[in-house]
């Protein structure tokens, strides 16, 4: 049975995610930006938090761990490579490790670039991937610690997941990301459609998260770096995928 997913808006533009396994009663939180909305959502659902999964060390993803842990006693899971700058970990993770939430398990994927110790969690049985600030809706995270080559390798790993996978990322930056994507590919019908759907979601008060990987492959300029039309759009028709990705990232930084 697939896990139940609840997206929890936090802070100004962060997302946390709750995953619930009805059979076992276990519930996981992915990232901890803010305690109050998470604890309120747990109470409203009647779920008991058992696990906290952390994608990376930035404060807006971990700062509520102490309060949430104190309230719930949940086990904390995070990257072994970043243990020195994460809250105390009960389970230090490396690539390929698994985290069980009831009968379902997440596979840990190393995705350096935004930070060196960034990880993602892929739940293949539920077709879910929690990508933090690596792969984002129509975008990717800034390269605060990693290189373009590292981030491109990370995005390539995520792009190889099944296309029906729901990508759950850490922020709502979608309006700006789509404007940038459309500046590069103004005639992309998938982008035009996605912008229209986003406008509808905003009008109806629906959260624009998650999106399928198939939608990202059709609209996310960073994942589209290998395509001839994207290489032409940035004036690098013969360049490597990594070089094209780096150019797109540099342009987005200034957009």
Curated annotation (Swiss-Prot):
Enzyme's top EC category: hydrolase
Pathway: Secondary metabolite metabolism; methylglyoxal degradation; (R)-lactate from methylglyoxal: step 2/2
Source domain of life: Bacteria
GO biological process entries: methylglyoxal catabolic process to D-lactate via S-lactoyl-glutathione
Family statement drawn from the similarity comment of this UniProt entry: Belongs to the metallo-beta-lactamase superfamily. Glyoxalase II family.
Species: Fuscovulum blasticum
InterPro entries for this protein: Clx_II_MBL, Glyoxalase_II_hydrolase, HAGH_C, Hydroxyacylglutathione_Hdrlase, Metallo-B-lactamas, RibonucZ/Hydroxyglut_hydro
SUPFAM superfamilies noted in UniProt: Metallo-hydrolase/oxidoreductase
Keywords: Hydrolase, Metal-binding, Zinc
Co-factor binding details: Binds 2 Zn(2+) ions per subunit.
NCBIfam families reported for this sequence: GSH_gloB
Name the UniProt record assigns to this protein: Hydroxyacylglutathione hydrolase
Entry cofactors: Zn(2+)
Protein EC: 3.1.2.6
Entry keyword annotation includes Zinc: yes
Biological function: Thiolesterase that catalyzes the hydrolysis of S-D-lactoyl-glutathione to form glutathione and D-lactic acid.
GO molecular function, one term: hydroxyacylglutathione hydrolase activity
Residues annotated as binding Zn(2+) 1: 56, 58, 114, 133
Reactions accelerated catalytically: an S-(2-hydroxyacyl)glutathione + H2O = a 2-hydroxy carboxylate + glutathione + H(+)
Residues that hold Zn(2+) 2 according to the record: 60-61, 133, 171
Complex formation: Monomer.
